[in-house]
Amino acid sequence: MESFSSKSLVLQAEKKLLSKMAGRSVAHLFADETSSEVLDELYRVSKEYTRSRPQAQRVIKDLIKVAVKVAVLHRSGCFNPSELALATRFRQKLRQGAMTALSFGEVDFTFEAAVLASLLTECRDVLLELVERHLTPKSHGRIRHVFDHFSDAGLLTALYGPDYTQHLGKICGGLRKLLDEGKL
């Protein structure tokens, strides 16, 4: 017996379409103004740190693709109860990471790259477990790329150093607003 599911086909088409569209400009369609500003600032930090515009664009594009695909999966009700528990755990870890990043940015001499890198690695692992049966290995690679990039100790140390003060201030301001509004 052939199993046909229009819902599955629609979901595949949505994911395929969104994967072709994802870019910094598309982020503004799926994210609010504050989220877009944080993404733009993360792009600037990545570009400055790597000294590579294409590399910075790739990491932000991958971040957007993954975020949109996970949102589509969630909105479409594709997650079973254990996966919904993982989604909650991921959100809690991401929120904890944002609050830790804010604390490090607001309190002098408290920054520890290893702590932030560890939180980001935990987020990556939970997200990979969440989407394991839903996304392709290519998407799993995108998740690893994004989290490995932003958990790099060199990047984190530079971000919290004197040369990136303006970037860090804007990122922290955006994170604070997202946390206050309950969007993160």
Curated annotation (Swiss-Prot):
Keywords: Cytoplasm, Immunity, Innate immunity, Lysosome, Nucleus, Phosphoprotein, Ubl conjugation
Post-translational modification: Phosphorylated by TAK1/MAP3K7; this phosphorylation triggers association with BTRC and subsequent ubiquitination and degradation.
Ligase is among the record's keywords: no
Primary location: cytoplasm
UniProt keyword DNA damage, yes or no: no
GO cellular component: cytoplasm; lysosome; nucleus
Localisation: Cytoplasm; Nucleus; Lysosome
InterPro entries from the UniProt entry: TNFAIP8-like, TNFAIP8_sf
GO biological process: innate immune response; negative regulation of inflammatory response; negative regulation of T cell activation; regulation of apoptotic process; T cell activation
Domain comment quoted from the record: The central region was initially thought to constitute a DED (death effector) domain. However, 3D-structure data reveal a previously uncharacterized fold that is different from the predicted fold of a DED (death effector) domain. It consists of a large, hydrophobic central cavity that is poised for cofactor binding.
Role, per record: Acts as a negative regulator of innate and adaptive immunity by maintaining immune homeostasis. Plays a regulatory role in the Toll-like signaling pathway by determining the strength of LPS-induced signaling and gene expression. Inhibits TCR-mediated T-cell activation and negatively regulate T-cell function to prevent hyperresponsiveness. Also inhibits autolysosome formation via negatively modulating MTOR activation by interacting with RAC1 and promoting the disassociation of the RAC1-MTOR complex.
Family stated for the protein in its record: Belongs to the TNFAIP8 family. TNFAIP8L2 subfamily.
Oligomer and partners: May interact with CASP8; however, such result is unclear since could not reproduce the interaction with CASP8. Interacts with RAC1.
Descriptive protein name: Tumor necrosis factor alpha-induced protein 8-like protein 2
Organism, as annotated: Bos taurus (Bovine)
